[in-house]
Curated annotation (Swiss-Prot):
Binding annotation for a divalent metal cation: D12, E13, D103
Main location: cytoplasm
Protein's UniProt name: Ribonuclease HII
UniProt superkingdom: Bacteria
Gene Ontology MF terms: manganese ion binding; RNA binding; RNA-DNA hybrid ribonuclease activity
CC cofactor note: Manganese or magnesium. Binds 1 divalent metal ion per monomer in the absence of substrate. May bind a second metal ion after substrate binding.
Gene Ontology CC terms, in alphabetical order: cytoplasm; ribonuclease H2 complex
Entry's Gene Ontology BP terms: DNA replication, removal of RNA primer; mismatch repair
């Protein structure tokens, strides 16, 4: 896959499924001499363990985060927006990688680097696992901040996903500018003439 490559970047995204908030991607180039122990798919880690690994990666690896906004998700689609976030994350690395390992089945359009998609890469490749951790930490922070601006939706715990309490809050409080209007539950709320919260 990455034979002969000296700087291999792992890329992963988080936030494709939520009803609210951006989609976030991270790119990580690990230092082969200083790889934190316990790297795994971010979904398999406790918050405490994820944050400890995030700190270790921040001090030992080349990391970068990219986002695509709710508006970009609406304008394009969630897959294209995810790829935009990935390209932005890669562009933010300190040094250009020689090769890119991307979680999933597709290489983003417009990526001008040698790359290989890896299905379930967040459990199979350490650099993709690292990227999943960095992306999750970054997006969770955004959702916790947004939860303070829009209390009642539970974003500090559901991170914008369509939990029962989030759906209930949508019915009672209406749709915010941070909701993805093309996603079914939100779309249905708007069709039922629910007030849009400013």
């Amino acid at each position: 896959m990455a034979l002969g490559a000296r700087r291999v970047a792992g890329v992963d995204e988080v936030g494709r499924g939520p009803l609210a908030g951006p989609v976030t991607a991270a790119a990580v180039v690990l230092d082969p001499a200083n790889i934190p122990e316990g790297l795994n798919d971010s979904k398999q880690l406790s918050v405490k363990r994820r944050n400890l690994l995030g700190d270790a990666l921040a001090s030992s690896a080349d990391i970068s985060v990219g986002h695509a906004s709710v508006e970009e998700i609406e304008q394009h689609n969630i897959l294209r927006a995810s790829h935009m976030a990935m390209l932005r994350a890669l562009a933010g690395l300190r040094l250009r990688p020689d090769f890119v390992l991307i979680d999933g089945a597709m290489v983003p359009q417009g990526l001008n680097l040698r790359a290989q998609p890896v299905v379930k890469g967040d459990t199979r490749c350490l650099s993709i696992s690292a990227a999943s951790i960095i992306a999750k930490i970054a997006r969770d922070k955004i959702m916790v901040d947004l939860a303070q601006q829009h209390p009642g939706y539970g974003w500090e715990t559901n991170m914008g996903y369509g939990s029962k309490s989030h759906i209930s809050a949508l019915r009672n409080l209406g749709v915010t500018p941070h909701h993805r209007r093309t996603f079914k539950p939100v779309h249905h709320m708007l069709y039922q003439d629910k007030n849009v919260k400013p």
